[in-house]
């Protein structure tokens, strides 16, 4: 692939279109410096831009990468004459030669994706979890006392938020509010049904679902769990479970609806008098993959991703990896630093549904190399080094032994690690000066390399920016 030839081709086509470098850059949402580098043969557009660059230059992607126009039939949206004789002309075969010293080897990891563990990327996206606000984060509704996204059942039940079942793991240092709650429901009259429900559950006919609920009660209680229409009159399926007690107990039933409904209700009720505390609720398709949707996992596999970055993105600045060592129901929600980003999706909170083990399982399933972003603002260098050890250490190390005890004997051997995300911008917490970030990144990177020498570390910062290049990228060159 001749970068110089491609660059000259881009330059000729741009001028033929009557565009300046700045105008082309604006259309592609890149910097004019990036366009200049393409035209000088110093780099190529990102692979995700190939189609857009070709469209702006009124050429095909094949022509763009070959650096020359070809005798092919063009779509009517390409402002070129069409040589049309009733049959499509045969495209000229394209041969790429690596005989130019300026050519670059294309990395097998060129095509990747950023899996940000937040918003609709997870809820209604990758996560198979069907219940919204399943751990009752945030303030309750003003009039009813029921958690947001839930509605009360029964005429005389009393609702209040109570001491939580959820909690954060070790290494949690962030300052957030209303992340951990449970819902307490008092029924003053035996024989009268009380409970809680949620609208807007999408169910498929004949599809089995796994329901789970963590409760604490004054005595053994018979719970009835139903999937119904929005009115509650048409019951698609129903199951009961008896349990409870002074300690938190997880109750489980399987539900298989006899009809499909894109706006079904999940309803949980009981008739025992007394107090019931609900710590978490879960509803998953029985065929889920580590808590993830099978159809989305298969689609990711079909994409052919070769590297997958997680947990972000901006969310990496909220994430505490040690929370993932807790059971999924017990992991506390995260209140977003930028609530405006998550408010339309999950009311300002994110729910820690996927942990490190799940992410590695996903990467192996789709054939992608894992690329993990640490949280250098809220986790210490030792805590981030422990994450590396959990992934790459053998059973002789404390965290390698912990991974093995959790059912994963062999190290994950995660090679690629990002030292934070987008430092230098106001939407990320922490020291956003070049020198300040550099110091944090150095401290974390050195500890991580002690835990697993030979890692490929990626530093963060705004690009292009001379100050960051001088006072951050250069000093970090020894480790990243």
For each of these PLM feature ranges, what is it?
Residues 279, 409-427, 461, 469-480:
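Aromatic- and acid-rich polysaccharide-binding/catalytic face
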Residues 1-16:
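A short, Lys/Arg-rich alpha-helix, primarily the initiator
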Residues 264-268, 272, 433-480:
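Noncatalytic carbohydrate-binding groove/subsite architecture in carbohydrate-active enzymes
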Residues 60, 78-352, 369, 385, ...:
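Extracellular and organelle-lumenal recognition/adhesion modules and their flexible linkers in secreted
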């Amino acid at each position: 692939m001749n970068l110089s030839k491609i660059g000259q081709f881009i330059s000729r086509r741009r001028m033929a279109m009557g565009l300046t470098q700045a105008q082309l850059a604006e259309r592609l949402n890149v910097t004019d410096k990036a366009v200049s580098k393409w035209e000088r043969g110093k780099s190529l557009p990102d692979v995700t831009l190939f189609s857009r660059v070709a469209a702006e230059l009124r050429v095909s992607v094949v022509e763009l990468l070959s650096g020359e126009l070809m005798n092919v039939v063009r779509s009517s949206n390409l402002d070129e004459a069409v040589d049309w004789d009733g049959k499509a002309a045969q495209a000229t075969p394209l041969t790429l030669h690596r005989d130019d010293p300026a050519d670059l080897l294309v990395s097998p990891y060129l095509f990747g994706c950023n899996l940000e563990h937040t918003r609709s990327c997870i809820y209604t996206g990758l996560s198979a979890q069907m219940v919204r606000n399943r751990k009752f984060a945030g303030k309750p509704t003003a009039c009813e006392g029921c958690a947001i996204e839930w509605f009360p059942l029964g005429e005389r039940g009393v609702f209040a938020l109570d001491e939580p079942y959820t909690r954060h793991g070790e290494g949690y240092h962030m300052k957030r509010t209303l992340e951990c709650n449970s819902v307490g429901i008092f029924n003053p009259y035996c024989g009268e049904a009380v409970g809680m429900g949620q609208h807007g559950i999408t169910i498929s006919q004949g599809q089995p679902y796994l329901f789970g609920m963590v409760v604490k009660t004054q005595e053994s209680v018979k719970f009835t769990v139903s999937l119904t229409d929005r009115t509650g009159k048409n019951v698609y399926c129903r199951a009961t479970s008896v349990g409870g007690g002074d300690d938190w107990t997880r109750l489980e039933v399987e539900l298989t609806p006899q009809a499909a409904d894109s706006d079904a209700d999940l309803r949980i009720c009981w008739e025992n008098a007394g107090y019931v505390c609900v710590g978490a609720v879960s509803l998953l398709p029985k065929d889920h993959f580590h808590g993830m949707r099978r159809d989305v996992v298969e689609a990711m596999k079909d994409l052919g991703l070769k590297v997958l970055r997680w947990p972000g993105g901006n969310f990496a600045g909220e994430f505490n990896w040690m929370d993932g060592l807790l059971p999924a129901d017990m992991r506390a929600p995260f209140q977003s630093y930028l609530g405006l980003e998550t408010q339309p999706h999950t009311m300002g909170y994110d729910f820690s549904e996927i942990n490190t083990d799940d992410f590695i399982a996903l990467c192996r399933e789709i054939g992608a190399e894992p690329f993990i972003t640490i949280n250098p603002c809220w986790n210490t260098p030792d805590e981030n080094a422990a994450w590396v050890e959990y992934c790459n250490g053998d059973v002789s190390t404390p965290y390698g032994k912990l991974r093995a005890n959790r059912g994963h004997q062999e190290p994950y051997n995660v090679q690629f690690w990002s030292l934070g995300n987008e430092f230098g911008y106001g939407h990320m917490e922490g020291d956003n000066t070049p020198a300040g970030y550099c110091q944090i990144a150095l401290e974390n990177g050195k500890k991580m390399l002690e835990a697993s020498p030979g890692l490929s570390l990626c530093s963060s910062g705004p690009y292009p920016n001379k100050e960051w290049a001088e006072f951050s990228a250069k000093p970090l060159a020894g480790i990243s």
